[in-house]
Amino acid sequence: MEAIAKYDFKATADDELSFKRGDVLKVLNEECDQNWYKAELNGKDGFIPKNYIEMKPHPWFFGKIPRAKAEEMLGKQRHDGAFLIRESESAPGDFSLSVKFGNDVQHFKVLRDGAGKYFLWVVKFNSLNELVDYHRSTSVSRNQQIFLRDIEQVPQVHGGDRATSLPQQPTFVQALFDFDPQEDGELGFRRGDFIQVVDNSDPNWWKGTCLGQTGMFPRNYVTPVNRNM
C-alpha cells in the first residue's frame, strides 16, 4: 500500500526513515508495531510513525465485496489478468485474489505463514503490495500463464462521447480521502466533502459533482451516505 505524509518526520534512530510532508511512501509492513509501519522512500527503508501518514488505497483493493460481485465486475473486463483483491468471505481476516482468464474468473486464496508473510505458492512477501507487483511478471497460476494487470478504468472523455447512467434519485457519497486531479476531466475534493453521483456505471471511476465542479473520481475514495439535499 502507499501512504501520503501529513507532516515532516526526521529520523532519530538508525532504523527510522525521514520524510517530508506530501511525500508518497510505500508501506512494506503494517504489522511490525502498533504505532510504527515499515516503509520505503527513494530506495531507502525504515520505520515511520503511523500517525504521520494517511493511507492511500490501491485501485485493486475492494475490501468486503462478495465473490459473485467480483466475478461480475471482472467478467466485464477485456483482458486476461485483470484482477482485484478482496477480503475473504469464508475466512474473515484473510484475503482472496480474483483474476479474469478467458471467459472465467479464477480465485486464489492469499496464504500467510507464522511470521505474517503473504504468499500464493512458494515465494513470500511482506505485504500484499509486494505480492501484486511480483505477480505482474510471474504467473499467479501453475497451469496457465496469467499475469496480473490493473482493471481498466473509464477513459477521460467530454460531452456526449460517453452516455452516462443516471441514478433515478440523487445519490450522495462522502470523501474518505483528499483527491487531487491528475488529468483533465477528473474531480478534485477534500476529505469530508459530499459529492453527488451522476454516473456509477463503472466499478472503478464514478462521475459526480462537488462545489459546482463535475468530473470523474475513484470510487474507493468515497463512502455512501444517507443525506437528503
Curated annotation (Swiss-Prot):
One of its GO terms (molecular function) is phosphotyrosine residue binding. Disulfide bonds: none annotated. Pfam families: SH2, SH3_1. Its main location: nucleus. It comes from the Eukaryota. GO terms for cellular component: COP9 signalosome; cytoplasm; endosome; Golgi apparatus; nucleoplasm; nucleus; plasma membrane. Changing residue 49 to L: Unable to reinitiate oocyte meiosis. GO terms for biological process: female meiotic nuclear division; insulin receptor signaling pathway; regulation of MAPK cascade; signal transduction. This is Growth factor receptor-bound protein 2-B.
